[in-house]
Design a protein with these regions (language model features):
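Rossmann-like dinucleotide/flavin-binding elements
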Residues: 1-15, 53-65, 74-143
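N-terminal Rossmann-like dinucleotide/flavin-binding domain of flavoprotein oxidoreductases
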Residues: 20-65
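Short, Asp-centered acidic motifs that coordinate Mg2+ and/or phosphate
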Residues: 70
């Protein structure tokens, strides 16, 4: 919208792709339309007046030195490699996590995790990340 109104827009993304948690959601079964929406957004970045910088972290000093009239900060988050998010206050760590073999939903859905045939999905938050990951694993024939 800002570019359509004649403003120069610069979007800075720390990762190599845009989408963050939406991309994870789109990797889950029956959610491919989310990835299609992200692809549409990426095509919008090709419009005149919009510059997209991927793989770029900005420090506060760089933001302060930028000649922008308006800065919108949408920081997102980075998941823990194990996927443990500590939703339950009394669990500072996941018991047994140091033994290894614990993977984040992101690693599972990107097929980076080396899993056996039997898998336990621990969803301490009770949200879409755990359910969607369990669904994807079931579709892969995991028990």
């Amino acid at each position: 919208v800002a570019a359509e109104r004649g403003h120069r827009v610069e979007i800075v993304e720390a990762l190599q792709v845009v989408g963050g948690q939406f991309r994870l959601a789109g990797m889950q079964p029956r959610r491919g339309q989310i990835l299609e929406l992200l692809d549409w957004y990426e095509r919008q970045f090709d419009r005149p007046g919009v510059r997209l910088r991927l793989n770029t972290f900005l420090e506060d000093q760089e933001v302060a030195e930028h000649a922008a009239q308006v800065v919108v900060v949408a920081t997102g988050s980075l998941p823990d490699d194990t996927g443990f998010q500590r939703w339950v206050p009394q669990e500072a760590t996941l018991p047994g996590i140091e033994a290894g073999g614990v993977w984040s939903p992101e690693a599972v859905l990107r097929r980076e995790a080396r899993l056996g045939d039997a898998v336990v999905v621990y969803d301490e938050g009770g949200n879409w990340r755990g359910v969607g990951t369990a669904w994807a694993l079931a579709e892969q024939g995991k028990k």
